[in-house]
């Protein structure tokens, strides 16, 4: 009989660093501009809100466990087979389910140096070993990833574009990565920010999924679609991979309001176009303005920028964060990603963007080079 006085988690669980979301509060009496979680300033599609409200009179009913209406809507938009689509409570859930289905103790999962923190959490939760591939210029390095592959590798995770850096790999490089992987290694393309990318050499990965047995693409409704509160994600996968995930997925992991809102949002092309147009206007404006102030900004194709600060007393990211927070401007510290001297800023409303630019201009002026 065990001598423990209370239930004890299995070995390794308490060693996992819990994910800490971006801050969402400002000092009392100060107008809040939350730019810490890459949420769209345009909000959700009115059609999605209306569809969600229509479900409110039937909350006693279980949702459709297969999310068929949402899968059909997604399939229609992208020309996919609905049977190869799995929906989840955000793409985070799907990333975790993929890991639990294909990884266990003794296995390894590879992700790039500044990749999404959820990959590490999911790998450790599955009993696997995280393997970090170094990046080059804050961008995933295909050669470094391939060099990290061993007979124990089960999954390679690639956020493309990457969060928090905003960098991306051209599709030719993604193809080269896939070509270099053994057939029994699953390549997971996390395309959470794909809607925002306007580069001729970028592709989210649908074509590669269609022609491969070991590639999955995940997407989310939390960013460009403005439905973060409803937690809606989806993935498209080879039939065998989708089947494995469905076997361990919760039976009602997506509620009726989320299913209805997601299906309506997919059909509202004009709303997505407006969100992308806003980002196309403000991403270069913010980048240029911050650079003119004297700050270094990693070139981004997402709806956010990574701003670098000097490693110097009084002038660093922590001090800048405190300065901004006192003015109601909430950015994201990214020290947990190994970037202690940087802040990530969501491209927000015109008012919010201008406020951050003005505040950082004042911060840099008040904290000049020594």
Swiss-Prot record:
What's its EC?
A: 2.6.1.9
What's the superkingdom here? Bacteria
Keyword presence, Glycoprotein: no
Cross-referenced InterPro entries: Aminotrans_II_pyridoxalP_BS (IPR001917), Aminotransferase_I/II_large (IPR004839), HisP_aminotrans (IPR005861), HistidinolP_aminotransfase (IPR050106), PyrdxlP-dep_Trfase (IPR015424), PyrdxlP-dep_Trfase_major (IPR015421), PyrdxlP-dep_Trfase_small (IPR015422)
The protein's GO terms of the molecular function aspect are: histidinol-phosphate transaminase activity; pyridoxal phosphate binding
List, alphabetically, the Pfam families matched: Aminotran_1_2 (PF00155)
**Cofactor needs:** pyridoxal 5'-phosphate
UniProt keyword terms in alphabetical order: Amino-acid biosynthesis, Aminotransferase, Histidine biosynthesis, Pyridoxal phosphate, Transferase
- For the modification N6-(pyridoxal phosphate)lysine, the affected residues are 223
In the record, the note on similarity to other proteins reads:
Belongs to the class-II pyridoxal-phosphate-dependent aminotransferase family. Histidinol-phosphate aminotransferase subfamily.
Q: Return the protein name.
A: Histidinol-phosphate aminotransferase
Protein's organism? Methylobacterium sp. (strain 4-46)
């Amino acid at each position: 009989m065990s001598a423990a006085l209370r239930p004890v988690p299995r070995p390794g669980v308490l060693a996992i660093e819990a994910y800490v979301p971006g801050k969402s509060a400002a000092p009392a009496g100060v107008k809040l501009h939350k730019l810490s979680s890459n949420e769209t300033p345009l909000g959700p599609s009115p059609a999605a809100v209306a569809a969600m409200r229509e479900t409110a009179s039937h909350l006693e009913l279980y949702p459709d466990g297969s999310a068929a209406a949402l899968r059909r809507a997604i399939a229609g938009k992208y020309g996919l087979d609905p049977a190869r689509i799995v929906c989840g409570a955000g793409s985070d859930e799907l990333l975790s389910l993929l890991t639990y289905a294909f990884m266990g103790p003794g296995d390894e999962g590879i992700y790039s140096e500044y990749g999404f923190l959820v990959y590490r959490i999911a790998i450790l939760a599955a009993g696997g070993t995280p393997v970090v591939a170094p990046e080059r210029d804050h961008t995933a390095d295909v050669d470094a990833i391939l060099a990290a592959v061993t007979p124990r590798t089960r999954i390679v995770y690639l956020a493309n574009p990457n969060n928090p850096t905003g960098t991306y790999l051209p599709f030719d490089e993604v193809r080269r990565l896939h070509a270099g992987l053994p057939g029994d290694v699953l390549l997971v393309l996390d395309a959470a920010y794909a809607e925002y990318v306007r580069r001729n050499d970028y592709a989210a990965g649908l074509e590669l999924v269609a022609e491969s047995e070991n590639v999955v693409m995940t997407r989310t409704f939390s960013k460009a679609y403005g439905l973060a509160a409803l937690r809606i994600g989806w993935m498209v996968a080879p039939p065998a991979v989708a089947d494995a995930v469905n076997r361990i997925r919760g039976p009602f992991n997506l509620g009726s309001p989320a299913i209805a809102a997601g299906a309506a949002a997919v059909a509202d092309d004009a709303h997505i176009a407006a969100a992308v147009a806003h980002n196309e206007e403000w991403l270069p404006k913010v980048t240029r303005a911050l650079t003119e102030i004297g700050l270094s900004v990693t070139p981004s194709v997402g709806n956010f920028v990574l701003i670098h600060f000097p490693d110097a007393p009084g002038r660093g990211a922590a001090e800048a964060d405190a300065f901004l927070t006192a003015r109601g401007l909430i950015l994201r510290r990214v020290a947990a990603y190994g970037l202690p001297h940087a802040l990530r800023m969501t491209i927000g409303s015109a008012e919010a963007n201008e406020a951050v630019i003005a505040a950082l201009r004042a911060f840099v002026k008040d904290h000049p080079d020594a």
